[in-house]
Amino acid sequence: MREILADLVAEQQGLDQSLQRAPDRDWRQRVATGGVTVQDTIAILAWGEQHSARLVTGKVSIDDLLADYGDLTTFEKGGIAEAKGKRPQEIIEWWRFARADVVDALSRMKPGQKVRWLDGKIAARTFATIRLADTWAHGLKILTSLNKEIVDTPRLRHISWLGWATLPHAFDAAGEDFDDVRVELGGPGYARWVFGDDDAENVIRGPAGDWCRLVVEHSDDPGELTATGEVAELALAVAGIYR
C-alpha cells in the first residue's frame, strides 16, 4: 500500500498547494462542468473523503449511502450543502482532516484486503486508486478554471490502469459486449505503460494524459489516442471510471 498511498497524498498535496493564498474570487470561480464553484468542488472532495473514511472503517455501508443519496449528483449536493456558510480556509481544513483519515485507515490494510463497494467488494489498493483519480479529476476542473498550469505526473499510471481495469464495467453500463482491449500509453518522462494481453486484437495507443482525461470524463475528445479494432474504437466512446 505504501506506493499508492504516497502517490495519493502527493496528488492531494499538489492540489492543496495550488490553492494556497488563492484570493476569494478564485474560490467563487465556476469550474468547467457541473455549474459549481472551486469552493464547491473542494467541499465535494472533503465530503467524499469523509464518507470514504467511514466506508473503509466499516462505520457505514455503501448500501446506507445509496439509500441516503441514490446517485452521485445527489451525494455531491450533500457536500455542497454541508459547506454552506463556511469560509474557504474552513473547507480546505475539512478536506485535509478527512483525507488524512482515509489514508490512515487504508495504511492499516493489506493491498488485497476488501472494501465493500458498488458492485461488491474491491481491493484496498483499488479503493486508494479511486481516491487518487477523484482528486486528479476534480483538480483538473479547478486548475483549468483558474488558468493554472497542469503538469502530468507519473501518478497518472494509477489512473491509466484504473481506466483500463474498469472497461468491462463501462461496456456493461453501455449495454455493449466486451472483448479484451490492450492499452499502450506513453507517460511523463518517456515512460511506457501497457495494460492487457499481448495478443489482444483490439488496441488503444497514445498519451497517458489523453487516456486519463477521457476515463475521468473531463474530455470526450480522444486527443492523440488511436484505436485498432472495433472494440477498441467503442472503448474510446464508452470508457469511464465513474460510469
Placement of each model-derived feature along the sequence:
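Basic, Lys/Arg-rich alpha-helical nucleic-acid-recognition elements, primarily the DNA-binding modules
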Residues: 2-35, 40-43
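C-terminal interaction segments
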Residues: 199-243
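Glycine/small-residue-rich hydrophobic helix-like segments
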Residues: 174-210
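Short amphipathic alpha-helical/adjacent loop interface patches that line ligand
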Residues: 12, 45, 49, 99, ...
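Contiguous mid-protein beta-loop-alpha structural module that forms a pocket-lining wall or clamp
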Residues: 79-140, 144
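Amphipathic alpha-helix face/heptad-repeat signature
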Residues: 4-11, 41, 91-94, 98, ...
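Short, helix-capping/interhelical loops that line the mouth of catalytic, cofactor-
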Residues: 1-3, 50-107, 149-150
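Short, contiguous alpha-helical
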Residues: 27-69, 117-173, 211
